[in-house]
Amino acid sequence: MDDRSLKLAEDFVSARYIEAGRESLRATARIMRSILAQRCCPDEGLTDAAIELILRQLSLMDTNNLAHHVGGGEREGRVVSALVRMRHFHLTHGIGRSGDLFSEQPKAAGSSLLYKITNVLMLDLIRQAGAPSTAAAVVVPMATGMTLALVLRCVAKTHMKELMKEAEAVQLQRTVTKDSTSATSAAPVQEPPMSEADRDRHDRTSLPVPATPRYVIWPRIDQKTALKCIDAAGLVPVPVQLRPAVPLARSAAPCVSTNRDSLDRGQDSIGSPSTPTSSSSLFLECHVDDVAAAVNAVGGPSQVVCVLSTTSCFAPRLPDNTVAIAQYCKKAGIPYVVNNAYGVQSRRIMTRLDAAQRLGRVDFVVQSGDKNFLVPVGGSIICSGDKERCKAVAALYAGRASMSPIVDLFITALSLGRRGMQTLWSDRYKCRARLIRQLRVFARERREVLLVDDSDDDKADEDTVGGSQRTSNAVVPRNDISVAVTMRAYGLPAAEASSSGAQLGSEQAGRVTNWAAARALGAQLFRSAVTGPRVITPAPSTPTTIAGCTFRNYGMHQDREPPCPLLVIACGIGMSESEVDALMARLRDLWPVPA
């Protein structure tokens, strides 16, 4: 209602009550005006009624909701089910036009505006998460894997154009050099006369045409989507094997091991003050030297479409060192794409991505909508430090796109606001600290090892390492989302478990461990309504082939046989402290302390 309508309403209801209603309407209008002007998420979340009012107003701007609309085409926003119309707030036209997500629809001004607003809301929240160098964000109504495939096709297309421009520049330089040499020659060689058509044909055939790059350098992560998106894009993955991670330097503290030999100790050391409850040395990471070696192995940067690395991952893998890889890609002239599936919730990951964008080359960063913003599966956010790159990938999308994931993110961003998202991020670190404290006791009681980043043993502060403040140049990739517990003797009789202690870590350790019992624990957890934790068992004799690549011990991120199965648990955004307590209670019931 406008001011004129409200003034007339005073003839029906007391003016002081109408004035209170006017102020409520103005408050919502001010927030919407602020979003449009400042292009950022509001600090405080809006009520559901206010958000629904905004959605209704936007939907009324679409032609299918005009009072006297007459449609004479094949796609006029017609929806036969009233329930479906309500589910979509009458926003039925989708987004994009003629194969470009950013194109405005003449029939859907409200939907087009909502999409543009959602993009700036996501950009603002991603900047707030720790990546202020991000210049643009585009929401794509596909899950992470297919969005990565779209990005890879865009990178391949753009990179080929760059190589062609370089080849043309080389040819131009050769022509200039040849003309200069001919002009200064004392006895120029008389060339036979050529027709215009022959000369044009000669110029085209002499242009060096670069080979089409088709390789994607991919640090190994045992997650099928990461490989299948490369295959779906018609490219060839080149896996880079991981190495054992270098332990973090940390202050002296009891009950913490930084040596792989912690798995080789006998029973006498178990339960003593030096009992290992954490071990960084069992983590795995990618070295930038191995990335460079993989590039050289396929023929150099001209044969490589991009490097595709991963930030968010399951233990014992660590996030890739995005800063080092970005610096290498900038030096080598190779595009760099980051799979940041659920990394927005990690302050560490986001600050390193920001540093990578500032110090090196990062073409695209792709993150999931559901894993980071707690919405239904179906949407992803593509980010870049270059607005033109985001425009290019949006223009590559074929056809129109679904509105559902965009509406979900729009509602969630307005409902939470900046402070609401910050609270969710802070609560995750509190839950993580609570989970680690309980898992530490759990592992010690069962004579197992908790695999967790050493610097996080007793602190939830993501900006400290080993009890000291992190310096700006200390860019060390670490996993602050996922942890793991060893299952060295799970399912073994007490006597056998005790006698096998001296052999733990050797090649025989995996053979004496009851892997079938370990796998059964994962099934029991699922039947107990506990989802998320997974049991990973070594499989040295059962190779797994995905997209033409064969792996051993798939799920453990390494070909060499790990010493034992692992119980992997992630503390993701939205997890509550009550869930942590319930998880640990059911885990204790299914995995009791050995007698």
UniProtKB/Swiss-Prot annotation:
Pfam families: SepSecS (PF05889). It is an enzyme of class 2 (transferase). The record marks E74 as: May act as a substrate filter by repelling compounds with a negatively charged alpha-carboxylate. GO terms for cellular component: cytoplasm. Its cofactor is pyridoxal 5'-phosphate. It is found in: Cytoplasm. Residues 174-208, 257-278 are annotated as: Disordered. It catalyses: O-phospho-L-seryl-tRNA(Sec) + selenophosphate + H2O = L-selenocysteinyl-tRNA(Sec) + 2 phosphate. The modification N6-(pyridoxal phosphate)lysine is found at K371. Substrate binds at R97, S98, Q105, R400. GO terms for molecular function: O-phosphoseryl-tRNA(Sec) selenium transferase activity; selenotransferase activity; tRNA binding. Residues 196-205 have a biased composition (Basic and acidic residues). Keywords: Cytoplasm, Protein biosynthesis, Pyridoxal phosphate, RNA-binding, Selenium, Transferase, tRNA-binding. Pathway: Aminoacyl-tRNA biosynthesis; selenocysteinyl-tRNA(Sec) biosynthesis; selenocysteinyl-tRNA(Sec) from L-seryl-tRNA(Sec) (archaeal/eukaryal route): step 2/2. Disruption phenotype: Impaired selenocysteine incorporation into proteins, such as SelT, SelK and SelTryp. No defect in promastigote growth rate and in their capacity to infect host macrophages. Converts O-phosphoseryl-tRNA(Sec) to selenocysteinyl-tRNA(Sec) required for selenoprotein biosynthesis. Belongs to the SepSecS family. Homotetramer composed of two homodimers. This is O-phosphoseryl-tRNA(Sec) selenium transferase. The lineage of its organism: Eukaryota, Discoba, Euglenozoa, Kinetoplastea, Metakinetoplastina.
